[in-house]
Amino acid sequence: MSRRHAAEKKVIPGDPVYGSVVLERFINKVMLHGKKSIARKIVYGALERFAKRLGLENPLEGFEEALENAKPVLEVRSRRVGGATYQVPVEVAPDRRSCLAMQWIIKHARSKPGKCMEVGLANELIDCFNKQGATIKKREDTHRMAEANKAFAHYKW
C-alpha cells in the first residue's frame, strides 16, 4: 500500500460561454502548445456549425448527447498470469469514459482531410450525434474486443 495520500482532483471552472465543466475539459483537450484562445475559437465555431446543421436550439445539449454516444462501457486491459498475457475485459470508470470519448472525437476530427479543424470537429460531432462515423466505430471495436475476451473476465483484479 502506498503511504502517500491520493492526489486531489483539480476543480476546473466552467467555460465562459456555456458555463459547462465538460466543455471546458474538451477545450483543454483540443488545446495544443498552451494556445487556449485558439482552442476555444475552434470548439465554439464547431459547436455553432454543429447546431446549425442539425437545427438545434442549444448546442451544448447536442454536444453532450454526441459525447454520450461515443463513451465506451467496456474495454480490455492486459493482465499477466503465469507466462501468458490475457486481454481482460473491464468496465470503464465514468471519468475515463468521457476522457476516452473526447480523445477519440478529437483524434478522428484531426485526421479528417482538409485544413480547418473547426469543420472536421463539427462533422465528427454530427457523426457521433447520429451514431455513426469513425469515433462510434472505435467504440464498437472496443466493445467487440471486450466481448471476444469475455472468457477471461474472471481474471479481474
From Swiss-Prot:
GO CC list: cytosolic small ribosomal subunit; ribosome
Keywords: Ribonucleoprotein, Ribosomal protein, RNA-binding, rRNA-binding, tRNA-binding
Keyword RNA-binding among record annotations: yes
CDD domains hit by this protein: uS7_Bacteria
Annotated InterPro entries: Ribosomal_uS7, Ribosomal_uS7_bac/org-type, Ribosomal_uS7_CS, Ribosomal_uS7_dom, Ribosomal_uS7_dom_sf
GO molecular function: mRNA binding; rRNA binding; structural constituent of ribosome; tRNA binding
GO biological process: one example: ribosomal small subunit assembly
UniProt key word Signal: no
Database matches in PANTHER family: RIBOSOMAL PROTEIN S7
Job of this protein: One of the primary rRNA binding proteins, it binds directly to 16S rRNA where it nucleates assembly of the head domain of the 30S subunit. Is located at the subunit interface close to the decoding center, probably blocks exit of the E-site tRNA.
Recorded family membership: Belongs to the universal ribosomal protein uS7 family.
NCBIfam families found in the cross-reference section: rpsG_bact
Name this protein carries in UniProt: Small ribosomal subunit protein uS7
Species lineage: Bacteria, Pseudomonadati, Chlamydiota, Chlamydiia, Chlamydiales
